[in-house]
């Protein structure tokens, strides 16, 4: 879009029930380029600077992973447009990606407690959502991470191999989220089960 003209941006909006890990802003834009008119929906995500949902934001890594998956695999992800780390623009690093319209489970309140998935969706719709989510998860875990140069995701401070690192990260996240209170019993039970059934391979 370096030669774009007549750029117009719609009023900004944001999701109210999901997308809290980063500041999320939705907008539409139209422009002209090489004599042609274009219009597209976009998502702007800004790195959190105060309230954070996760122990580590890994903001740069999010963009790098999504870009690689979109460019080099068949995993369905939004088209990543550009990344800007100059904090003088919006006060924090941000990236812009294409928007994929649809209905997603909400976080506030959790979709298991209220909202369209619990109150309106048919059992077949819930099954489709769960199975498509599992398919996407399996597709991500089936990629050749070495050919995609995903070595930057290594977190040796949490352990020797990836599985161990991820498990220790989850444990650290519980302690970080509320140092004065242990993890919920269901989470403790899940962590214990995972520890006892960890795969015996690197």
Predicted features and spans:
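Juxta-kinase regulatory segment immediately upstream of eukaryotic protein kinase catalytic domains
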Residues: 1-10
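ATP-binding pocket architecture of kinase catalytic cores
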Residues: 13-189, 193, 197-201
